[in-house]
Design a protein with these regions (language model features):
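Detector for repetitive beta-architecture
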Residues: 39-41, 46, 52, 58-60, ...
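Right-handed parallel beta-helix/beta-spiral solenoid domain characteristic of secreted/periplasmic
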Residues: 24, 59-107
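Terminal export signals
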Residues: 12-15, 31, 93
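Acidic Gly/Asp/Thr-rich repetitive segments characteristic of extracellular carbohydrate-active
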Residues: 17-50
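Glycine/Thr-rich phosphate-binding loops of Rossmann-like dinucleotide-binding domains
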Residues: 51-52, 71
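Sec-dependent N-terminal signal peptides
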Residues: 3-15
Length: 107
């Protein structure tokens, strides 16, 4: 599994951009998703995010857990436990709009 994850990142990173959330440019996960293009990675820092997310692109949406020392341990359980998307208390927390796309979600 570790090798598959690493391969996905190598392939997606050849011409892809990593968008860090939150940052001065992207305060919300959805802002990062909106700014992304197919092949990009939206990398979410620890925190509680009250958002309803809509994915319409082939991107990687991930917590920092997948980026923490990939050579020795690719899962950081503390980071996963501290990165929460709770929704905005209405509707679905995550909607993938197009059944023909394949976003990747980690951590």
């Amino acid at each position: 599994m570790k090798h598959i994850v690493n391969l996905l990142f190598v392939i997606s990173s050849l011409s892809a951009t990593t968008i860090n959330v939150p940052s001065s440019d992207y305060l919300t996960i959805q802002a990062g998703i909106n700014a992304s293009v197919d092949g990009d990675t939206v990398l979410v820092d620890e925190g509680i995010y009250s958002e309803n997310l809509i994915l319409e692109k082939e991107i990687v949406l991930a917590s920092h857990a997948i980026y923490d020392d990939l050579d020795s341990e690719w899962i950081d359980n503390d980071n996963i436990n501290n990165t929460i998307i709770s929704g905005a208390h209405n509707g679905s927390c995550l909607v993938i709009k197009d059944g023909n796309i394949g976003p990747t979600i980690f951590g």
